[in-house]
Amino acid sequence: MAKKPKKLEEISKKFGAEREKALNDALKLIEKDFGKGSIMRLGERAEQKVQVMSSGSLALDIALGSGGYPKGRIIEIYGPESSGKTTVALHAVAQAQKEGGIAAFIDAEHALDPAYAAALGVNIDELLLSQPDSGEQGLEIAGKLIDSGAVDLVVVDSVAALVPRAEIDGDIGDSHVGLQARMMSQAMRKLGASINKTKTIAIFINQLREKVGVMFGNPETTPGGRALKFYASVRLDVRGNTQIKGTGDQKETNVGKETKIKVVKNKVAPPFKEAVVEIMYGEGISKTGELLKIASDLDIIKKAGAWYSYKDEKIGQGSENAKKYLAEHPEIFDEIDKQVRSKFGLIDGEEVSEQDTENKKDEPKKEEAVNEEVPLDLGDELEIEIEE
């Protein structure tokens, strides 16, 4: 390969230096006009990894791939009626409050049950609640909360109930073609950048509708147009499967239902993973149940016949007794939970190893305390029993 003439190399270097200077001048001008951080090289970003907040369900965190809901993104949860959509969202609210954050609930359906929310772990005294009169009002309230930067999670329940003002003021039977879709499209354009900037998680619950005249393919669709589908980083399809029967006196009573949550869209991890959870009536997602199942599959909790054991210690005969043990021993629950998350790469293994190291450090201290030599005072009286 022929070398470039020396003169041509000098011209190339000079031209490259001029381009670099022009680029730096443009970057400085952009930052001056729009603020620091408005443009930067990707490698200069302080945080490359997407920050997440746990969904409140171990199985769902694993299915999401990143360990929870990504911060600064839009999440859509949809499914049939009574499938558990609001329950999944309320667990996210409880988790946000548990981590010290502030959560808001835009109840467009006017159907939130405070007692049920409290049973799921939501601090209803600290929960911000709005029951808007129209779709525009609900989205404006959500926008102001997000723009404040003080709210960590905003839940809108539901998109289908965000009725445009023109439809409310009109008569029943009036045609309002595409009105709600235009409202949602405008809201997504307006809220998208603000959500990302403030690192707020915005969860939109949606219902299902069926397209008329569809002979082939899936006739199901979600109301509110296509904007939400495009702007959402994660979309969850929630479906109730089989009913769960009780035990003992309640063996003929339905005490919950097995629910399948499918990640149909995921921009931060591989999509199409599924989580199967048990939603118990009046309690929400059974955290002990999902941990017991996943830990047993990973052989962290051993199962022999009907008995479950952890670290060679039996924790219960039958799944119900094992769940009860985990509920009564939160330190064991947290220890197993960390091991499971470490196995799936949701947390660094250092946390688990540090805990094991601390436990090992404590063991010799206990032995030293037991084997510690006590100096003998010759003035003491000793009683010696001699066996005949």
Curated annotation (Swiss-Prot):
Location(s), subcellular: Cytoplasm
Gene Ontology cellular component annotations, sorted alphabetically: cytoplasm
Gene3D superfamilies per the UniProt record, alphabetical: P-loop containing nucleotide triphosphate hydrolases
Record: residues binding ATP: G79, P80, E81, S82, S83, G84, K85, T86
Record region (Disordered): 347-388
Assembly behavior: Interacts with DprA; probably forms mixed DprA-RecA-ssDNA filaments.
Protein name: Protein RecA
Gene: recA
